[in-house]
C-alpha cells in the first residue's frame, strides 16, 4: 500500500527530528513522499534526508494539521509529530492491522499510562482526568463524561478499538481525515499552548463513524522535544487545559446527548471534576493556581456564549 508521511513541526526538534526522518526512510514499507508542514516564520531545519519537501502554513497544533493536503497524491497518510522514533517495520505492521481488523484509523499507544506511579494514577482517577479500566477485551481508550479519558490497564491483544488516542502518529485515508472537517476546531489554537487537539480529533472521528484502532507494543518512542517546563509555561498549560475542558465537554459530551437524564449526569460529572481540581489547589495553598483554573473556566464559558461558537456545526 502506498502512503505519504506528513509531519507538523516548528523546525526546532533538532536531533529528535533527524531520528524521525532517518526512521522514515528506513521503513520496510517506505513512504512515497515526506511532506513537512512547518509554521510560518520558522526556519527550515538543517536536519535532512534530502528527500523531504517543506510547505509553510499558519502556526498552531490544529492549524498545522487541519489542512486540505492538496500536495498528497496517495490514498493513505501517515500523520506524524516531529519527535518520534519509528521501528523499521511499524508502517507495514499498521497497514496489516488496518486490514486485519477492518479499521479506518490506526494509531500506536505511545504513552505507558499503567507505568505511572501509583500516587499519580490515584490522583488522576480521583480527579476524573484519567482512570484505568480492567478486564476490558474490546476497548483501548474511551472518553469519559468528565472530559477525561480511561485506558485499558492490561492489554493482552495487539490492538483494541478506541474513542481517542495520542495524535503524534496515526494512519488513515486522506478522504476519511478530510471528512471530519477538523478545521472547525481551530478554537483550540486560541491559547498560547494548544491542549486536547488529539482528543478532539479522534473523538470527532469516532462520532463520525470511523473505526479507530489502538495498537500496542509497537516500539515507537516519543522523544519529547517539548521538554521545557518553566513556571510561565506551566501556568499557561493549566489555563489552556481548563479552557479546553470547558469547551470540549459542552461541545462533544453535553450537546450531543439526547437524554435529559444523561445530560444531568454530564453536568454532575464535569461539576465534580472542576470542584475537585479547584479544591486540590486550595488544600495545597496554591491560590494562584486556583485563580488560574477559575479564570480559565470562566473564559471557556464565555466562549460558549460567543457567536463564533454558536456558528460551529453541531456534533451529532
Where do the PLM segments sit?
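N-proximal low-complexity "stem/linker" segments adjacent to membrane-targeting elements
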Residues: 1-26
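Glycine-rich, basic loop-to-helix element that forms the pyrophosphate-binding segment
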Residues: 56-72
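Acidic donor-binding loop at a coil-to-helix junction in glycosyltransferase catalytic cores
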Residues: 165-169, 188-203
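Active-site-adjacent helix/loop segment of glycosyltransferases
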Residues: 211-285
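Catalytic donor-sugar/metal-binding loop of nucleotide-sugar-dependent glycosyltransferases
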Residues: 178, 193, 199-221
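Short aromatic/hydrophobic "clamp" motif used to bind/position activated sugar donors
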Residues: 77
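Conserved donor NDP-sugar-binding/catalytic core segment of glycosyltransferases
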Residues: 91-136
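Short, flexible, basic/aromatic active-site loop/helix in glycosyltransferases
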Residues: 126-162
Amino acid at each position: 500500500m502506498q502512503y505519504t508521511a506528513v509531519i507538523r513541526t516548528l523546525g526546532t526538534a533538532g536531533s529528535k527530528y533527524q531520528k524521525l526522518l532517518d526512521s522514515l526512510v528506513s521503513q520496510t514499507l517506505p513512504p512515497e513522499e515526506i511532506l513537512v508542514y512547518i509554521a510560518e516564520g520558522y526556519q527550515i531545519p538543517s536536519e535532512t534526508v534530502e528527500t523531504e519537501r517543506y510547505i509553510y502554513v499558519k502556526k498552531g497544533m490544529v492549524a498545522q494539521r487541519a489542512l486540505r493536503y492538496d500536495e498528497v497524491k496517495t490514498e493513505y497518510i501517515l500523520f506524524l509529530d516531529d519527535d518520534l522514533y519509528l521501528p523499521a517495520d511499524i508502517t507495514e505492521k499498521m497497514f496489516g492491522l488496518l486490514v486485519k481488523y477492518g479499521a479506518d484509523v490506526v494509531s500506536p499507544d505511545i504513552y505507558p499510562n499503567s507505568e505511572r506511579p501509583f500516587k499519580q494514577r490515584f490522583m488522576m482517577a480521583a480527579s476524573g482526568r484519567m482512570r484505568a479500566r480492567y478486564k476490558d477485551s474490546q476497548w483501548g481508550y474511551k472518553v469519559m463524561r468528565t472530559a477525561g479519558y480511561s485506558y485499558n490497564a492490561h492489554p493482552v491483544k495487539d490492538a483494541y478499538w478506541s474513542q481517542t488516542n495520542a495524535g503524534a502518529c496515526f494512519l488513515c485515508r486522506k478522504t476519511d481525515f478530510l471528512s471530519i472537517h477538523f478545521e472547525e476546531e481551530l478554537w483550540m489554537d486560541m491559547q498560547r499552548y494548544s491542549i486536547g487537539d488529539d482528543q478532539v480529533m479522534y473523538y470527532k472521528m469516532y462520532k463520525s463513524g470511523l473505526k479507530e484502532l489502538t495498537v500496542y507494543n509497537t516500539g515507537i518512542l516519543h522523544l519529547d522535544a517539548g521538554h521545557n517546563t518553566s513556571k510561565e509555561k506551566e501556568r499557561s498549560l493549566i489555563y489552556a487545559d481548563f479552557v479546553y475542558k470547558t469547551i470540549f465537554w459542552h461541545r462533544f459530551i453535553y450537546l450531543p446527548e439526547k437524554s435529559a437524564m444523561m445530560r444531568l449526569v454530564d453536568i454532575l460529572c464535569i461539576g465534580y471534576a472542576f470542584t475537585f481540581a479547584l479544591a486540590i489547589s486550595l488544600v495545597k495553598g496554591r491560590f494562584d493556581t486556583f485563580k488560574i483554573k477559575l479564570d480559565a473556566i470562566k473564559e471557556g464559558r464565555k466562549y460558549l456564549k460567543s457567536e463564533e461558537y454558536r456558528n460551529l456545526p453541531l456534533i451529532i
